C-alpha cells in the first residue's frame, strides 16, 4: 500500500551515489594489507579500478567456492590474488581429511566439512540407459527407477518435471572407464603368464641348438661339474681346527663360545 501511495523508488540520495562511486575512499598506505573486513570493489568487477594494490576494497576475481586454509591461520600472503575465499563461511570450508579418509573425525568442533561418502558417488550412465555390464561391482550408483510409459510411447507432457524415469538412448560419452572385473583380470594374468613361459622355453631351445660350447662338452667335464655342484650343495660346517676366534686369536672355537673377554686379543700382543 505504501508503494502505491508514496513510492520513493525513483529518488536517489547523495549518500547512495557516494557509496556506489566510492567517493572519499582513501588509498592504502602500502600494498598487501589485510582487507578481509572490507567491501568488494565495484569498479574491479567492471575492470575499471585504477588504484590497483592500493585500493582499500577487496578485488575478487571469479567465484571462489573454497575458504583459504592459510587465511584461517592468518598465514596467507597472496591477499586479493589468492584463488581461495578469504571469508569465514561454513558452507564453503574445505573437506575434512580425516572424515574423508577414515570415515570419522574425533574433533567435536571440527571447522571443516564432513561430507557423506555416498553423496560423492555418481549415478551410472550405463545403468540409467538400461544395462551395466559391471553389475553390483560397478563403482557408480545403480538406482532403480520406474520408466515413464508416456515417454516410451513418444511424448510426456510433464517433461523434466516428470516423477518417472526418462531413459536416454544415446551412448554415454566422456565417462571414466570402469575397473575390470576380477575374472577378467585373472584371465588376463593367466594369458600373460602363458606367453612368458612360451617365450622363455623357445629361447632356451634356441640357445641349446645354437651354442657350440654345449655340443663340444665331453661327458667327463659334465660329470666333474655335477660333482662340484654336489659337493658345494652338501658342504657342512668347517672343523674346529680351522676356526680362528677373532676375540682372542686362538683356534679351536668360535667367537660366540669364547670364554675370554672382548679385550683378550691385547694380551696376546
Curated annotation (Swiss-Prot):
Keywords: Metal-binding, mRNA processing, Nucleus, Repeat, RNA-binding, Zinc, Zinc-finger. PROSITE patterns: ZF_C3H1 (PS50103), ZF_CCHC (PS50158). A zinc finger (C3H1-type) spans 35-61, 62-89, 90-117, 118-145, 146-169. Gene3D superfamilies: Zinc finger, CCCH-type, Zinc finger, CCHC-type. A zinc finger (CCHC-type) spans 243-260. InterPro entries: CPSF4/Yth1, Znf-CCCH_3, Znf_CCCH, Znf_CCCH_sf, Znf_CCHC, Znf_CCHC_sf. It comes from the Eukaryota. SMART domains: ZnF_C2HC (SM00343), ZnF_C3H1 (SM00356). One of its GO terms (biological process) is mRNA processing. One of its GO terms (molecular function) is zinc ion binding. Residues 173-197 are annotated as: Disordered. It is found in: Nucleus. Belongs to the CPSF4/YTH1 family. Component of the cleavage and polyadenylation specificity factor (CPSF) complex that play a key role in pre-mRNA 3'-end formation, recognizing the AAUAAA signal sequence and interacting with poly(A) polymerase and other factors to bring about cleavage and poly(A) addition. Cpsf4 binds RNA polymers with a preference for poly(U). This is Cleavage and polyadenylation specificity factor subunit 4.
Amino acid at each position: 500500500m505504501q508503494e502505491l501511495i508514496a513510492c520513493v523508488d525513483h529518488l536517489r540520495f547523495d549518500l547512495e551515489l557516494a557509496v556506489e562511486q566510492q567517493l572519499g575512499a582513501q588509498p592504502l598506505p602500502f600494498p598487501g594489507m589485510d582487507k578481509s573486513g572490507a567491501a568488494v570493489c565495484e569498479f574491479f568487477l567492471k575492470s575499471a579500478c585504477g588504484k590497483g594494490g592500493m585500493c582499500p576494497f577487496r578485488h575478487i576475481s571469479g567465484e571462489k567456492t573454497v575458504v583459504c586454509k592459510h587465511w584461517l591461520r592468518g598465514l596467507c600472503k597472496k591477499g586479493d590474488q589468492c584463488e581461495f575465499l578469504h571469508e569465514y563461511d561454513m558452507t564453503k570450508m574445505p573437506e575434512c581429511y580425516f572424515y574423508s579418509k577414515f570415515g570419522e573425525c574425533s574433533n567435536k568442533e571440527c571447522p571443516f566439512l564432513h561430507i557423506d561418502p555416498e553423496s560423492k558417488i555418481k549415478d551410472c550412465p550405463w545403468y540409467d540407459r538400461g544395462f551395466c555390464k559391471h553389475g553390483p561391482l560397478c563403482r557408480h550408483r545403480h538406482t532403480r527407477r520406474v520408466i515413464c510409459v508416456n515417454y516410451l510411447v513418444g511424448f510426456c507432457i510433464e517433461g523434466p518435471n516428470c516423477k518417472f524415469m526418462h531413459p536416454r538412448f544415446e551412448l554415454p560419452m566422456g565417462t571414466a572407464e570402469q575397473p575390470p572385473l576380477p575374472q577378467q583380470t585373472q584371465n588376463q594374468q593367466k594369458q600373460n603368464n602363458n606367453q612368458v613361459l612360451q617365450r622363455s622355453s623357445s629361447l632356451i631351445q634356441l640357445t641349446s641348438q645354437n651354442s657350440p660350447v654345449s655340443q663340444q662338452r665331453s661327458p667327463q667335464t659334465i660329470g666333474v661339474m655335477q660333482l662340484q655342484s654336489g659337493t658345494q650343495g652338501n658342504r657342512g660346517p668347517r672343523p674346529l681346527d680351522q676356526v680362528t676366534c677373532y676375540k682372542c686369536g686362538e683356534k679351536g672355537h668360535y667367537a660366540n663360545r669364547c670364554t675370554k673377554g672382548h679385550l683378550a686379543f691385547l694380551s696376546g700382543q
